[in-house]
Each structure stands twice: as C-alpha cells, then as structure tokens.
Design a protein with these regions (language model features):
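Flexible coil/turn and secondary-structure edge motifs
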Residues: 15-205, 225-226
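Short active-site neighborhood of thiol/selenol oxidoreductases, capturing the structured segment around
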Residues: 23-28, 207-219
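Residues at alpha-helix boundaries and the short loops/turns that link adjacent helices
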Residues: 90, 218-221
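Short, intrinsically disordered, charge-balanced linker/junction segments flanking boundaries
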Residues: 220-229
C-alpha cells in the first residue's frame, strides 16, 4: 500500500511539473507601465501582465516613493515594469521580445518621450540563461537596424531579476479602466526584417470567469476528455 501511494504521488508530481514547464515569466520595463501592460495582454500566448516595480535599492517599492522629486534621477530608484507570464507553446520568447523592443525607444536613457527619470528606464530582467542568450542576440540585431535608421546606441539594461513588486491595484489594467487614459506611443517605427508572427488577440474572455478554456497538452490528459463531452 505504501509503495502504491508513493508511486501515485510521484506520478501526480511528474504530471504537475510537466504541465507547467511551458509557462515562463519575464519582467520588462519600457517607460510608463500602463500602456506596456495593455500591449502585452493583447498578445496571443500571454497569460497575465502585471504592472509593478523592480531593480531598486534603498527606495520603497510604491508609486509615491519612486515618483518623489529626490528619486527622479536616483540610479537606485525602482523602474516601472511589467511582469509578463506567457505560454511558450503559444508565443515564443523571441516574438515576445520583438514586441517589447518595437513598442518603445530603447535608445533613450532614463526616459521615454516626455516621461523623464530613472523610473522610466528601458530594462529587461530575465529569469534564466536561455532568455539571456536570446536577449543578447536580439539586441545586437535590433541595434544594427536602429543604426541604419540614424538612432544611437541601445540603453536597455539587462540583468537577472532579483525581486518583482506588484504595483498598487489602481495601476492594474489602468487603460482598460480608463480608455482615454495616458498611453503615449514612443516606438521608433523600426521593425525587425523578418515577419513578426506576434498577433493581437482578444484575451478579455479569459478574465470574465464564465468560460472554461482547455489548452491541449502534448501528453495524454484523461481530465481533458471530460471537458470535451
């Protein structure tokens, strides 16, 4: 009996572990997090996008503190970022990063347009070495494209994530709550040469709580069959 219980527990653990290996996170900063969050949530394959703060030291992670005048040019200030949770089976990390780079101006230092200060810095906080390698490759490629169009050097900071702090509730889904809210476009208009496979997708139905969404697994899932009936 003990052996059967142990074997069953191991199978459950293995199935649970396997079912989440395609889910990853990346924390991205590209200026004001309101518009950035909206952009990620529109991508097919993005499970969640949460506005927050990261990469600060000696500064409390809340909006009031990071926007103090004394912290405007503080190199240790937190950056406005978005924690993006995505399904690798539906959107590649490369496509997600292409969207990130094309959606803002990474050549601006500590600002995006009229949003000026270290809180608006361009920053990528990766979760693993695989992400880091792809980021390095894409930044090199994008720099070449930007240079051809007369832009300067990319200022994006790249480092491993230490801690992400979720922003206050009123910042979450801000543009959805305030359709006419502040959402400037600071993108350069420079696009990657290859076709971008990222397409906007209406994920709003997933947040209504009235539908069951079944994502087909790569392995046999006896429970999934029940939902098809």
């Amino acid at each position: 009996i003990t052996l059967l219980i142990s074997t069953f527990s191991l199978l459950i653990f293995a199935e649970k572990n396997q079912s989440t290996t395609h889910i990853e996170k990346i924390v991205l900063g590209s200026g004001c997090f309101w518009g950035a969050e909206k952009g990620y949530e529109a991508l097919n394959g993005v499970i969640d996008a949460v506005s927050g703060y990261a990469d600060g030291k000696g500064v409390r992670a809340n909006y009031r503190e990071i926007t103090r005048f004394t912290n405007k040019f503080n190199p240790n200030n937190h950056a406005e970022v978005v924690e993006v949770t995505y399904n690798k089976n539906l959107i590649s990390f490369e496509d997600l990063m292409i969207h990130y780079l094309e959606s803002h101006d990474p050549t601006q230092l500590n600002r995006q347009g009229n949003d000026i200060g270290t809180q608006y810095r361009s920053i990528i906080l990766f979760s693993n070495t695989s992400q880091q390698e792809k980021i390095t490759q894409l930044l090199t490629e994008y720099q070449s494209l930007l240079s051809k169009e007369g832009y300067g050097a990319i200022q994006t900071v790249v480092k491993p994530l230490t801690k992400f702090y979720e922003a206050e509730n009123y910042h979450q889904d801000y543009i959805k709550k305030n359709p006419n809210g502040y959402c400037p476009d600071h993108s350069t208009g420079v696009r990657f040469a290859r076709t971008n496979s990222v397409k906007d997708f209406d994920n709003s139905i997933l947040k209504e709580g009235k539908n069951i969404v079944v994502i087909e697994p790569e392995w046999y899932c006896p429970y999934c069959d029940k939902f098809r009936e």
